[in-house]
Amino acid sequence: MAGHSKWANIKHRKGAQDAARSKIFMKLSKEIFVAASGPGGADPETNPSLRLAVSKAKAQSMPKANIEKALSKASGNSKNASEFKELIYSGSLPGGAIILVICLTDNLNRAISNIKAAFSKIGGQLGKSGSIPYIFERKGVLDILKEEYENSDQLMLEALDAGAEDVQTFEDFSRIITNPSNFQEVKDKIDKALSLENYATAEIQYLPNTTVSFEKEKLEKLETWIETLEDNEDVQEIYHNIDF
């Protein structure tokens, strides 16, 4: 994708957060709660899944008090956390858009029913549950706004030296791509080398290999549809190949 498209996607996500901050934090709290209640325990230093969830929350500017509350809630509540199940659905929309929806739900029937209704409303088709379309690759993503670093060349060198797969530099930010298996290791090394604290994005994502473009009117309709689906309490993440 072009740099503008990547940055537009970041701004789109941040705008959605500003408009419904409490819902975003609720989803992040649920993710932290489930990770902390698992076999890895409530210590991010010894629980990779929890550490990833906390890094993601911090990148979304979730207050420290909210994170600590979710961690505290997890203590002794593993039974409640076990009721949450991950559900992955992929589907296609008219015009060639591919959508990947990841849910974390304590009610599978409700989640499935809502996802099916959303795709039906826009004329889309759902694929098999649990399948990841071939156009998506699972990658670690670190987005760093330009004001957070002084020299893009130094950032690139430090990131590649830390084990990053790729570094993409754009007008307003840089994107560091990693293998999911060494995401936290790369992030820790970059943090130490450049004294970085703030990220626009710090999480594992499904990135599309190709994108599709739409005319403005259709694009606005798709954006509204995605935002409505994001508001669903069971939906944690939505990935797509639309060039916004």
Curated annotation (Swiss-Prot):
Pfam families, alphabetized: TACO1_YebC_N, Transcrip_reg
A GO CC term attached to the entry: cytosol
Keywords of the record: Cytoplasm, DNA-binding, Transcription, Transcription regulation
Protein localization: Cytoplasm
SUPFAM superfamilies: YebC-like
Molecular function via GO: DNA binding
Keyword Aminoacyl-tRNA synthetase: no
Keyword match DNA-binding: yes
UniProt GO BP: regulation of DNA-templated transcription
InterPro entries recorded: Integrase-like_N (IPR017856), TACO1_YebC-like_2nd/3rd_dom (IPR048300), TACO1_YebC_N (IPR049083), Transcrip_reg_TACO1-like (IPR002876), Transcrip_reg_TACO1-like_dom3 (IPR026564), YebC-like (IPR029072)
UniProt similarity note: Belongs to the TACO1 family.
PANTHER family: TRANSCRIPTIONAL REGULATORY PROTEIN YEBC-RELATED (PTHR12532:SF6), TRANSLATIONAL ACTIVATOR OF CYTOCHROME C OXIDASE 1 (PTHR12532)
Protein name (database record): Probable transcriptional regulatory protein MMOB1910
Organism per entry: Mycoplasma mobile (strain ATCC 43663 / 163K / NCTC 11711)
Upper taxonomic lineage: Bacteria, Bacillati, Mycoplasmatota, Mycoplasmoidales, Metamycoplasmataceae
